[in-house]
Amino acid sequence: MTTAKRPLALLILDGWGYRENPHNNAIFHARTPVLDKLNAQFPNSLISGSGLDVGLPDGQMGNSEVGHINIGSGRVVYQELTRVSKAIEEGEFEENTVLCKTIDDAIKANGAVHIMGLLSPGGVHSHEEHIEAMCRMAVKRGAKQVYLHAFLDGRDTPPRSAKGSLAHFGDLFTTLGQGRIASVIGRYYAMDRDNRWDRVSQAYELITQGKGKFSYSNAVDALEAAYSRDENDEFVAASSITDAQGQTASLNDGDSLIFMNFRADRARQITRSVINADFDGFERAVTPKINFVTLTEYAADISAPKAFSSSDLVNTLGETLQNLGKTQLRISETEKYAHVTFFFNGGKEDPFKGEDRIMIPSPKVATYDLQPEMNSTELTDKLVEAIESAKYDVVICNYPNGDMVGHTGNFDAAVKACEAVDACIGRVVAALAKVNGECLITADHGNAEQMTDESTGQAHTAHTSELVPFIYVGRDASIKDGGRLSDIAPTMLSLMGQPVPAEMTGRCIIDLKE
């Protein structure tokens, strides 16, 4: 006979930060009676999810990948942004054997070096300083054909902020005497992660064949034309940039292609379309034989050389629960499924023993402000069912709404998103009460609490560095000050009466009262 579990649930409200200023604060203006009541009745605090507290540079806003790695590992994990930047500063980047080889291979084959990535100072998926270092390195090693395929941001940066980056790289190539920007496209197309292959196919054609919806002789002109079409950076249509002779750049046999994004989730689809022989997401007109390199590891099943190998995280929360013989459930919508699985498990793709996973498809809408509740009702239906089954010791759920709708910059939609999540939390807490379970409610980073950029007046679509909530719905207790995301896993194990592995350098921040 199976013993009924008393589950401990962790609810991660993605993009849900705390900001005292009510101005353009969707969370403040949302009607959230459930969270208001929980904050009034149960121990709660604010914890850090950004900067040095999550292994990022001081002041750098947090993000979903970083947040989930820190939560799941129970330690501060120094992130790829910091790691690559340090390698550049100390001269190790130019000596990276994987990068050197792929440049040299292209030169020997009389081929071109293509560099693609999110051209942005946002620091969430990439950093333009890394891309600049790569361009300089390619020219320094003797590449005569260097092409930059620029994915534009407008999501982790202001919606119309790419002009400075494009102008800078135009000047950079002039100074270097080699290379140019070969294409421009919004991340909406090139960095999809929801199997919208019709989007990715446009980026693929642009990079491999130089075929875009539009063609210009200058990248800044391409951007300004996009703005005149009312396309913000994120949504800039595929635009090829021609050389002085009016020629576009294409990806040919013998060329090298270096992907400079360090974050995996939005890099996987375009990568698979380029390198997988059995790819069937869309019809590929050409499949050139190239040297393809990723900056970091994107997935275990992506067989491409990587410039920076992942550090192995052992005794994460998932692995520890496995070793204790505990059962666990990971559940979210498509948009955040990788975060509660791959990233939460420290970059491990396969589930641990006793770990079940449920993915609820995110709604097929162009942007999530069109359906701010997303599929939170269906997600909660499955979550409540799992809790009431008394099958799991630990349940980990991510509600994507605050982040995904916050990124649209639509204030009214973000308010509705927060209200939808609040209603779902009420159902989850009620289900836990039926089985004598407990709950921790937190967030991975901020977003929806600031919907307008105070300095520019533009929509604020990026994350923030605000503190995030931490609520314990359970026994009589108090919460210590100064918590951070890496304290959550040790706290969960302590609440379960289990030892905390030595590798978890976070601390338990809940003191249970006798």
Swiss-Prot record:
Give the transmembrane region(s): none
Superkingdom of origin: Bacteria
Note the Gene3D superfamilies from the entry: Alkaline Phosphatase, subunit A, BPG-independent phosphoglycerate mutase, domain B
Statement: the UniProt record of this protein carries the keyword Manganese: yes
Q: Can you quote a single GO CC term?
A: cytosol
Reactions catalysed, semicolon-separated, are: (2R)-2-phosphoglycerate = (2R)-3-phosphoglycerate
Which residues are recorded as binding Mn(2+) 1? 403, 407, 463
Note on cofactor = Binds 2 manganese ions per subunit.
Q: Which residues bind substrate?
A: 125, 155-156, 187, 193, 263-266, 336
Annotated keywords? Glycolysis, Isomerase, Manganese, Metal-binding
**Which cofactors does this protein require?**
Mn(2+)
Assembly and oligomerization: Monomer.
**UniProt record similarity statement:** Belongs to the BPG-independent phosphoglycerate mutase family.
What protein am I looking at?
A: 2,3-bisphosphoglycerate-independent phosphoglycerate mutase
Query: Which gene produces this protein?
Result: gpmI
